[in-house]
């Protein structure tokens, strides 16, 4: 059922400008194009692209858009290959407010480096840099599909398809907003960190890192990574695949939410940095690769860190141009 817009577009735009400043509310077609056009798929018109600079600003933008009866699309790095963070065509029943969160950066190390709290604009590259001096690394070291991917975007889409040992990006510890059945907005704090009672207090304290070790709950009864996947993927003779889109067992609140809720932060496990060796195995016979895969998953004491099928053309391109890409990522992130 369509929701009837409650206020005019001019009134809503005024509220959005009051929340984040006029410079961060974009309405011109040229200014909004890079936000409303997907990396590979998806493009469409929007009422505005809004770029909040704090968690509290993000909350105010969300409040205004929901109260006004508009569609909200959340976006971070806009690097996804399958859509979801941009409009897809112009056949929507209401105007769209696209909220880009890249200005809200922040990675907070907790539990001696065993875990982190990531804000909406945190990228995998920044997270890796933060953890490197601690001898730790994140679930994903780099976006498997695009450079500059965001941490929260990965959680929303259960990313990490090449990761065999760690599995999909997953956590049950998150701070998010949802629209209740009566149409009102609710902030849900399932981070396992005591930050106060009101949205304003919770978001302001989290943004500034205003919490102590005593505020962090260790035994939450929830997990901050997918500990089952390594076992599931080794069941090579099972009737069901270990990994498939929208796996219900890996959909939990923020994880796999794909834009159905609005994320403000996630709490994630980190992992000891391990030495690794990369092997390239080539064959013209698919059965050879199947045999290799089954051996790696069943005969080794631990499954491989990661694995990927690469067709010949992609390998040749990587061999020719990969060094340039490596240097670019290494120096510029």
Question: Locations of the language-model features?
Answer:
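General beta-strand structural signal in soluble alpha/beta enzymes
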Residues: 24-29, 51-52, 72-76, 83, ...
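Short, conserved charged micro-motifs
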Residues: 9, 57-60, 126, 286-292
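C-terminal substrate-recognition/cap domain of FAD-linked oxidoreductases
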Residues: 35, 267-273, 277-333
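N-terminal flexible segment immediately upstream of the FAD-binding catalytic core
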Residues: 1-67, 80-117, 143, 268, ...
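FAD-binding subdomain of flavoenzyme oxidoreductases
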Residues: 125, 132-136, 140-290
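A common structural junction motif
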Residues: 20, 67-70, 135-138, 297-306
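Short, structural beta-strand-to-alpha-helix junction motif
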Residues: 54, 79, 115, 122-127, ...
């Amino acid at each position: 059922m369509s929701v009837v817009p409650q206020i005019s577009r001019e009134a809503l735009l005024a509220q959005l400008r009051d929340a984040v400043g006029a410079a961060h509310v974009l309405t011109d077609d040229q200014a909004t194009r890079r936000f409303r056009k997907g990396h590979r798929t998806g493009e469409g018109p929007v009422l505005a692209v809004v770029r909040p600079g704090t968690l509290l600003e993000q909350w105010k933008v969300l409040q205004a858009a929901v109260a006004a009866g508009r569609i909200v699309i959340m976006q971070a790095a806009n690097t996804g290959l399958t859509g979801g963070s941009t409009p897809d065509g112009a056949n929507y029943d209401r105007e769209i407010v696209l909220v880009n969160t890249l200005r809200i950066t922040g990675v907070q190390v907790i539990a001696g480096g065993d875990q982190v709290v990531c804000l909406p604009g945190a990228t995998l590259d920044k997270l890796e840099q933060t953890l490197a001096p601690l001898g730790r690394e994140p679930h994903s070291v780099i976006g498997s599909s695009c450079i500059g991917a965001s941490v929260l975007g990965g959680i929303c889409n259960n990313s990490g398809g090449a990761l065999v040992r760690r599995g999909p990006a997953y956590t049950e510890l998150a701070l998010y907003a949802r629209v209740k059945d009566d149409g009102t907005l609710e902030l849900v704090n399932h981070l396992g960190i005591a930050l106060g009672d009101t949205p304003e207090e919770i978001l302001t304290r989290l943004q500034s890192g205003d919490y102590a070790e005593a505020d962090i709950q260790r035994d939450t009864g929830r997990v901050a990574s997918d500990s089952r996947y390594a076992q599931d993927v080794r069941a090579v003779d099972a009737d069901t695949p270990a990994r498939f889109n929208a796996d219900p067992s890996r959909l939990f609140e923020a994880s796999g939410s794909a834009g159905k809720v609005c994320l403000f932060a996630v709490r994630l496990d980190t992992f000891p940095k391990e030495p690794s060796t990369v092997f390239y195995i080539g064959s013209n016979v698919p059965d050879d690769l199947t045999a290799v895969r089954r051996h790696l998953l069943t005969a080794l004491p631990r499954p491989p860190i990661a694995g990927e099928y690469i067709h010949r053309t992609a390998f040749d391109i990587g061999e020719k141009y990969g060094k340039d890409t490596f240097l670019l990522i290494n120096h510029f992130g």
